[in-house]
Amino acid sequence: MSKVTFKITLTSDPRLPYKVLSVPESTPFTAVLKFAAEEFKVPAATSAIITNDGIGINPAQTAGNVFLKHGSELRIIPRDRVGGRGVGTDRPSSSSSKTQ
């Protein structure tokens, strides 16, 4: 059975750490996502894998299909960086006014 190799970078860390994973091409990509999340110590259930161009990858396919469609260099991002609840809450709302 052939293997595919992915270089997965954690984009939420300013140091941009990465892991290189080699898996059988028939591996469900959900397993790749889960393993990568565990390696980076981020929650798998609320993480996403995207391409370097920012395109989200549907994990309901095999690792071989992902490799053929998107290549070997991918990024993992925790949901708090992907538009989950709480995004933008650190910014003042437009209704608050500042006096100068």
From Swiss-Prot:
Its biological purpose: Ubiquitin-like modifier which can be covalently attached via an isopeptide bond to lysine residues of substrate proteins as a monomer or a lysine-linked polymer. The so-called ufmylation, requires the ufm1-activating E1 enzyme uba5, the ufm1-conjugating E2 enzyme ufc1, and the ufm1-ligase E3 enzyme ufl1. Ufmylation is involved in various processes, such as ribosome recycling, response to DNA damage, transcription or reticulophagy (also called ER-phagy) induced in response to endoplasmic reticulum stress.
Keywords: Cytoplasm, Isopeptide bond, Nucleus, Ubl conjugation, Ubl conjugation pathway
InterPro entries to which the protein is assigned, alphabetical: Ubiquitin-like_domsf (IPR029071), UFM1 (IPR005375)
Pro-sequence residue ranges: 84-100
Subunit structure: Interacts with uba5. Interacts with ufc1.
Keyword Metal-binding: no
PTM text: UFM1 precursor is cleaved by UFSP1, promoting its maturation: processing of the C-terminal Ser-Cys dipeptide is required to expose its C-terminal conserved Gly residue.
Top-level taxonomic group: Eukaryota
One biological process term in Gene Ontology: response to endoplasmic reticulum stress
Main localization (coarse): nucleus
Record's subcellular location: Nucleus; Cytoplasm
Chain residue numbers at which the record places covalent cross-link Glycyl lysine isopeptide (Lys-Gly) (interchain with G-Cter in UFM1): 69
Name of this protein: Ubiquitin-fold modifier 1
Family: Belongs to the UFM1 family.
Region (Disordered): 78-100
Gene transcribed to yield this protein: ufm1
One annotated Gene Ontology cellular component of this protein: cytoplasm
Organism of origin: Salmo salar
Cross-link (Glycyl lysine isopeptide (Gly-Lys) (interchain with K-? in acceptor proteins)): 83
